[in-house]
Amino acid sequence: MKIFHNTHHAQHAGRQEMFRGRMVDCHEVPDRLRYVLEELQRRPVGPLLTPDAALDVDAAMARVHAPDYLAFLASAWHDWVAMDPANAERDALPSVWPLAAKHGFRTDAPPLNFAARLGQYAFDSGTPLMAGSWAAARQGAACALAAAQAALAGERFALALTRLNLKPSRGRARRSALWFRLHRAAPARSWPVRSLQS
């Protein structure tokens, strides 16, 4: 088995999230993947690999996510800190959710205000965005692509180990998702993967 490990996953390590009306420690933490890695190292089932840097992960993500959403994620941390340098010490959590399509607002251009953009692309206030969220999500997508390529090349078993959730925000996958749930599997699933039963 080839196991493609997201070496950047720990860069997405939120401090707090909103849960049932109060701020709590984040539920989705790097330790979740660390436990799996420790077990895989205890009973080796295959090499831990990193994706080839030459993979065109940006093109693959663009096949399943809207360009404005990807552009937002790529610049979100910079924009958050530009609002207030003190934000560098805080995770970004949305506080408003402009429901543009529901209320007939324009959807062809993102809002100029960062807080509105954050809310437009966020699913909830339970998933903070931090300095390393984009790098972690992008590397997770690369892991999914590498595993798909390995399967297409004949590898019987390939795993993308990346704190992955296969379901992006319901019905809004192209333009919003929980940051750690950037739909990493979708680029791989958009490929014509043959059956691996043989």
Question: For the regions a protein language model found, what residue spans apply to each?
Answer:
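HDAC/HDAC-like amidohydrolase catalytic core signature
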Residues: 1-197
